[in-house]
């Protein structure tokens, strides 16, 4: 299983703080899950605490983090 963790406003947007999903080949495949449909395209993505893109391969027990973009000055 893959553990998906949502941070900041994405917890409210997606309706969960943590979700477990079956293993799929890539992060992009994982993001096609209907429960993740509201996720904005500019979301920051990480796999096992390293920034990742949609082509990043996934494996059993990976942790995926979904974070809103950071802004400020």
Could you describe each region identified by the protein language model?
Residues 1-72:
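Ubiquitin-like/PB1-type beta-grasp interaction modules and other compact soluble beta-rich domains
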């Amino acid at each position: 299983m893959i553990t998906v963790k949502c941070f900041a406003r994405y917890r409210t947007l997606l309706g969960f703080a943590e979700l477990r999903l079956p293993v799929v080949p890539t992060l992009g495949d994982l993001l096609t899950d209907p429960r993740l449909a509201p996720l904005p395209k500019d979301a920051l993505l990480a796999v096992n605490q390293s920034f990742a893109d949609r082509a990043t391969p996934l494996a059993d027990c990976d942790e995926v983090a979904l974070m809103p973009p950071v802004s400020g000055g």
